[in-house]
Amino acid sequence: VLSVANKRSTAIEVMRPAGLWAMEQYGKQAVKWGNERAGIELPSGDRWLIHAANDSAGVGFSINMAFLDEAWSIPSQIFMGSIGPTMSERLMPQAWLVSTAGDSSSDLMASYRQRAIDHLGKEDPGNILLLEWSAPPTADPDDVETWKYASPEWNDKRNIHSGGE
């Protein structure tokens, strides 16, 4: 597994629960924190590597799974030029793009989302699985109820800065 994010510290945070588990199961030597070799290595040789989303992410490795956190801020050229090629020799590689929607410059997440939407209802669904938590397209973006649709962690006690509830 290669875990990347817009910041290396974010990628480490995603790995943290698995790292704590690996330490309990295999001892401290199974997990490295905070240096260039941060990640998990099991006695079987299986590894979970951590990297910032930059031009060298994954280069030199052959991986089965890439986990891209905060994919809205990872440019598509990082995935296509660095991370994607590391999976080219694998039989069933997976790339997981996890993210909020981002903005108009979020080309990686937006392009894969659109590819998945374009295959909806077709006989051949393609090879992209889209799991999305979002408001309906016709929802009013100024309505607090719409905000609740778009947030799986919504809490009614939030302080709404726009003068709402």
What are these regions (language model features)?
Residues 1-2, 65, 94:
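Residue-level preference for the first positions of well-ordered beta-strands
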Residues 2-54, 113, 117-131:
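Conserved nucleotide-state-sensing and coupling region of NTP-binding domains
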Residues 5, 70, 99-100:
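Conserved residues at beta->alpha junctions
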Residues 9-12, 48, 57-58, 74-75, ...:
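Flexible loop/turn segments at secondary-structure boundaries
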Residues 19, 23-26, 72, 84, ...:
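Hydrophobic/aromatic-lined pockets within catalytic cores
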Residues 35-88:
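Conserved RecA-like ASCE ATPase "motif II neighborhood" in helicase/translocase motors
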Residues 36-37, 77-165:
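Non-catalytic, compositionally simple segments
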